[in-house]
Amino acid sequence: MAMAGVFVLFSFVLCGFLPDAAFGAEVDCSRFPNATDKEGKDVLVCNKDLRPICGTDGVTYTNDCLLCAYSIEFGTNISKEHDGECKETVPMNCSSYANTTSEDGKVMVLCNRAFNPVCGTDGVTYDNECLLCAHKVEQGASVDKRHDGGCRKELAAVSVDCSEYPKPDCTAEDRPLCGSDNKTYGNKCNFCNAVVESNGTLTLSHFGKC
């Protein structure tokens, strides 16, 4: 289960309540302290208080402040689904689907085109469970089924602005991001440097560790 939570300073571009997303609850982001960073930008200051909440993106955040910080930093409309950690994923048995082995030794899952959408923990809607299994097996992705039916829009992968990168040196700030390559990047700087190296093929899967 993805979890985002550390002591961080995030770019603070707005105050007040986060938008009330589907099934979500408003979080008053204006109650959290802010400061000014070296670049003169207002930043939101969060601590490590362990009061986990589940965001509408399916990620468990350490506390309300961290949810606000990620949402504001990346311009999302993620709000609070409920207090406590996000619920466990729905079990699925990928071994029940037929498969074959390619000439180069890779296992390929054989799927039909039946349309029975499921939502993956990566925020992607798959046409059916078999196709989710195919992605998991063939790409080695750490993705599971969150629920039957398509993902809500809050779960869609967030576009990260990497226009100011690459940068030769990144800070040690620990605000993890999970990339579409199933690798965890320590912060936005590390992630964006990797995006540049990939010629833009790398995207954000979700906040927190993979």
Swiss-Prot record:
Residues 25-88, 89-153, 156-210 form the Kazal-like domain. Transmembrane segments: none annotated. GO terms for cellular component: endoplasmic reticulum; extracellular space; protein-containing complex. It is found in: Secreted. No decrease in activity observed after incubating at pH 2.5 and pH 7.4 for 1 hour. Retains 20% activity after incubation at pH 12 for 1 hour. It comes from the Eukaryota. The record marks 48-49 as: Reactive bond 1 for endoproteinase Lys-C. The record marks 172-173 as: Reactive bond 3. The record marks 113-114 as: Reactive bond 2 for trypsin. Residues 1-24 form the signal peptide. GO terms for biological process: response to steroid hormone. One of its GO terms (molecular function) is carbohydrate binding. Keywords: Allergen, Disulfide bond, Glycoprotein, Protease inhibitor, Repeat, Secreted, Serine protease inhibitor, Signal. Its main location: secreted. Disulfide bonds join 29-68, 46-65, 54-86, 94-133, 111-130, 119-151, 162-192, 170-189, 178-210. Serine protease inhibitor. Inhibits trypsin. Avian ovomucoid consists of three homologous, tandem Kazal family inhibitory domains. This is Ovomucoid. It comes from Gallus gallus.
